């Protein structure tokens, strides 16, 4: 029997290590390639003569230039063969409910509006050279106009008859935020057992540390809304709001602003350093993301959800911190950038039905139902959400205060604070979340805060090397609104239009 000497054993180990490293490297590349980049689509009218063919060609060239520049915006999802339409999960939920011509028109109008909005940011972020190649005369303004005009022209031609409308309906889909191949390669059924155990432990800890009373002996900084609004005027807005043919409320910009001012929270953060101050995301001169804490802002997103055969208005308030500081080099949760989304779901009378918080990574989701909601005895999710008590308050008389602990920015307290006696605090203005989709990048260029995967560059966490079998792309990384998976076990999204029906029943309690 031949016994390998020490030198041969070392050589074999080295070769084995190289093979393992190559396999792991190929696996990482493969898994990264499975992530969900925006998928531009081409109109079937490409190559036609006349205005329709010209417009189809225009969208194809615009998408090509946007892709080459790396500025494709991933907030919404494309509709195959209809480059002038995009869809989110809420709009996609009406796919089987638009037989009526008026409903179909309202539905397609909303999809076109999403596309026009996204393309405006993409055009803003295009390098000047690319813009000049697309429209050397009118520049970006000419491109905005052409997006609108060509979208109108193609939509009118594409949907004259019932059959093409049905064809489009079948192609409308909002992809989920889970990569199936990762779950296969990561032996998800086994991995999910360990993840479920960790989630259960976090739920227990979060329950025991949560309170609807103010924190005691905290050294904290408070931020209060810069502007106030009148409760009765807000109730009037909600009571008289018009609806489109889908039943979705339609608010003017001024009405939206009044709603956001009315329900804006007080932010209270236990402070130990600059990482506990909120601010404005910026691109630095070195081309990296940071948060300027000298300019505290709260970003707003208007959304809608479907509950008990109603369409409810949701107000999202998003803040950003410079970091979640690491406790050590091996801290898998710490890193650059952190943030929180606080959401209020309103009843038709303006009374909040549900408060929610989730970190901007999609992590640490918490629901705080008001008395008019009853938690279902069995919530039909593989990973049940954490449901906590909501404070009992009158929004006309009280702010909701969202109190977070230092460093982790976990929400530890949700409590009422009288509007007549505002605390010593720093005032914050509200800003449209869309601003983050096109930020100043250099002296002339602009860039979204988020890359084409919907992630904030530089916000990656070490936990992504542990939790990749869950199928979530870059767990712990900060994400663009509309791209938040909020569970590691099963599938659940922050903007799921039917999540409230799966979690709650409506009661008559006022």
Give the residues covered by each predicted segment.
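Charged, compositionally biased non-catalytic regions
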Residues: 219-292
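C-terminal motif of bacterial Sec signal peptides marking the signal peptidase cleavage site
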Residues: 32-33
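Sec-dependent N-terminal signal peptides
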Residues: 23-28
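Short, aromatic- and cysteine-enriched interfacial helices/patches
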Residues: 3, 36-37
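Short N-terminal edge-element motif at the start of the domain
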Residues: 277-355
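Bacterial N-terminal signal peptides that target proteins for export
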Residues: 4-22
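Domain-length functional cores that host ligand/cofactor binding and catalytic or interaction surfaces
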Residues: 37-234, 336-338, 349-510
């Amino acid at each position: 029997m031949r016994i390998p000497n020490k030198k041969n054993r070392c050589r074999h180990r080295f070769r084995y290590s190289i093979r393992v490293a190559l396999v792991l490297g190929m696996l990482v590349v493969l898994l990264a390639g499975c992530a969900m980049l925006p998928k531009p689509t081409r109109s079937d009218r490409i190559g036609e003569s006349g205005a329709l063919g010209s417009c189809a060609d225009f969208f194809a060239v615009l998408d090509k230039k946007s892709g080459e520049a790396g500025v494709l915006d991933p907030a919404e999802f494309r509709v195959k063969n209809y480059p002038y339409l995009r869809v989110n999960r809420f709009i996609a939920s009406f796919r089987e409910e638009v037989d009526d011509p008026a409903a179909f028109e309202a539905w397609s109008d909303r999809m076109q509006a999403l596309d026009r909005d996204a393309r405006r940011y993409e055009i803003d972020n295009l390098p000047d050279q690319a813009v000049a190649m697309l429209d050397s005369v009118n520049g970006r303004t000419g491109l905005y106009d052409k997006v609108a005009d060509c979208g109108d022209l193609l939509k009118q031609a594409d949907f004259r008859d019932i059959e093409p409308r049905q064809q489009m309906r079948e192609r409308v889909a909002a992809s989920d935020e889970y990569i199936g191949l990762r779950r296969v390669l990561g032996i998800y059924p086994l991995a999910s057992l360990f993840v479920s155990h960790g989630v259960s432990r976090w739920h227990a800890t979060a329950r025991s540390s949560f309170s609807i009373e103010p924190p005691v002996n905290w050294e904290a900084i408070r931020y209060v809304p810069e502007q106030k609004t009148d409760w009765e005027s807000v109730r009037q807005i909600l009571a008289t709001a018009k609806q489109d043919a889908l039943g979705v409320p339609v608010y003017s910009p001024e009405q939206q602003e009044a709603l956001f001012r009315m329900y804006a929270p007080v932010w209270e953060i236990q402070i130990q350093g600059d990482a506990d101050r909120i601010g404005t995301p910026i691109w630095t001169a070195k081309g990296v993301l940071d948060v300027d804490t000298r300019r505290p802002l709260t970003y707003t997103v208007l959304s809608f959800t479907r509950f008990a055969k109603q369409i409810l208005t949701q107000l999202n308030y998003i803040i950003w911190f410079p970091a979640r500081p690491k406790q050590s080099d091996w801290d898998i949760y710490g890193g650059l950038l952190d943030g929180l989304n606080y959401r209020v779901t309103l009843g038709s009378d303006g009374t909040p039905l549900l408060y929610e918080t989730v970190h901007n990574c999609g992590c640490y989701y918490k629901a705080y139902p008001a008395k008019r909601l009853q938690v279902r005895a069995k919530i039909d999710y593989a990973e049940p959400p954490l449901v906590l008590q909501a404070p009992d308050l009158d929004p006309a008389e009280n702010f909701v205060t969202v109190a977070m602990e230092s460093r982790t920015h976990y929400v530890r307290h949700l409590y009422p604070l009288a509007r007549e006696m505002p605390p010593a605090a720093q005032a914050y203005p509200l800003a449209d979340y869309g601003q983050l989709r096109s930020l100043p990048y250099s002296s002339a260029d602009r860039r979204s805060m988020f890359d084409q995967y919907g992630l904030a560059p530089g916000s990656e966490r070490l936990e992504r090397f542990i939790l990749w079998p869950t199928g979530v792309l870059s767990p712990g990384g900060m994400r663009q609104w509309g791209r938040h998976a909020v569970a590691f076990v099963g599938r659940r999204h922050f903007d799921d239009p039917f999540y409230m029906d799966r979690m709650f029943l409506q009661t008559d309690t006022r």
